[in-house]
A protein has these predicted regions:
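Hydrophobic faces of well-ordered beta-strands that scaffold small-molecule active sites
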Residues: 25-29, 59-61, 92-96, 133-138, ...
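N-terminal small/glycine-rich loop or linker at the start of catalytic domains
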Residues: 18-36, 95-109, 132, 137
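Short, acidic/polar
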Residues: 38-52, 112-128, 176-180
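Short loop/turn motifs at secondary-structure junctions
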Residues: 23, 52-55, 129-132, 162, ...
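Active-site groove signature of glycoside hydrolases
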Residues: 125-145
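Alpha-helix N-cap and loop-to-helix initiation/capping positions
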Residues: 39-46, 69-72, 76, 108-116, ...
Length: 331
């Protein structure tokens, strides 16, 4: 029977999510990839245990995560909970999302309707064997559904006890501001927007979302902080055959030209001067943004989780380092 590491909370740092009372680890684990039914169960279980032993308490899922079919990541995570992690449920923040296509017909496609969101969460809870999730997100803005309906659905989910907090994902600053006004009127515990952000993807800065979120007490949970794995040492010298780009599993390979390799190599030199790997530097860089609560990492094996979680040991940057990084990114 699994017993968690007694010093796990000494290995991680935590931050309040916006102005809420919920503390999240600065590094969280996402289950988008490598937790489907085509993956090895023992490796999945080892990754969850390794993360928890490192003080990672936030586990991020969605109804459509996993392959070969939607929902398999939730099913496998639920099995891990039952097999070994159930004694630690109250020490975990479990989140799931709904918004993308999930089942046939008009009620299971991309939308933010009350029917879809509530039905989807019920299915997710059943797959994971849970009575509630800690955070339930609307996964993507839906222009065809009134925001009032989406907000009211999320509010009623909290009031029904099926979620403790609500969040949104992939909402722009304008969209976030609009729905947050409704949540304030309803007194809904809306605490977080989950968005993509990295050294190579800085749209939230141009959009103003990060400044708005910080000023208005909304946390930001960042996914793809390594830009689909491009911000790692593995691609500097070429494309390994066993990598996601090598297997043709990501569109990001189209951006890996000679100019990008030179940029990655220059960033890797700065990382080395700090005693970090490129991936650790990239994660630390995201976390230096005061609006960011947590970075959500993916992994294919436990060692990757331990390596990337170590980014929290070096979150400070000198002015010279910031200037050098900005110069490289501007090339």
């Amino acid at each position: 029977m699994y017993t968690a590491n007694d010093s796990r909370y000494d290995k991680m740092s935590y931050a309040y999510c916006g102005k809420s009372g919920l503390n999240l680890p600065r590094v969280s684990l996402g289950l988008w990839k490598n937790f489907g039914n085509g993956d090895v169960y023992s490796n999945m279980e080892d990754m969850i245990r390794t993360a928890f032993d490192l003080g990672i308490t936030y586990f991020d899922l969605a109804n459509n995560y996993g392959s070969p079919f939607n929902g398999s990541a939730e099913e496998n995570f639920g099995r891990i909970l039952r097999d070994s992690m159930h004694p630690y449920r109250d020490e975990m923040v479990i989140a799931t999302k709904a918004g993308y296509d999930m089942w046939p017909g008009p009620y299971g496609c991309l939308n933010g309707s009350r029917k879809y969101l509530i039905s989807s969460l019920d299915q997710s809870l059943k797959r994971m064997g849970l009575e509630y999730v800690d955070i339930f997100y609307h996964h993507i803005y839906d222009s065809k559904t009134p925001l009032e309906e989406t907000a009211l659905a999320l509010d009623s989910i909290v009031r029904s006890g099926k979620a403790l907090y609500v969040g949104i994902s992939n909402y722009s600053r304008e969209q976030t501001e609009e729905i947050s006004k409704i949540f304030r009127e309803l007194r809904t515990p809306f605490i977080v927007n989950q968005i993509s952000y990295s050294m190579l993807n800085r749209w939230i800065e141009r959009d103003g979302l990060d400044n708005w979120a910080y000023d208005n007490g909304v946390g930001l949970a960042v996914y793809s902080p390594l830009y689909q794995g491009l911000l790692t040492d593995k691609y500097i010298g070429g494309v390994p055959s066993d990598s996601r780009i090598g297997r043709g599993q990501t569109w990001i390979g189209r951006e890996l030209d000679d100019k990008m390799r030179r940029k990655l190599a220059a960033l890797a030199e700065i990382a080395a001067s700090r005693g970090q790997k490129l991936s650790q530097l990239a994660l630390s860089w995201v976390l230096k943004n005061k609006a960011v609560t947590t970075v959500i990492i993916g992994a294919s094996r436990p060692a990757q989780i331990a390596e990337n979680a170590a980014c929290i040991d070096k979150l400070d940057f000198s002015d010279d380092e910031v200037s050098a990084i900005e110069a490289i990114l501007a090339e």
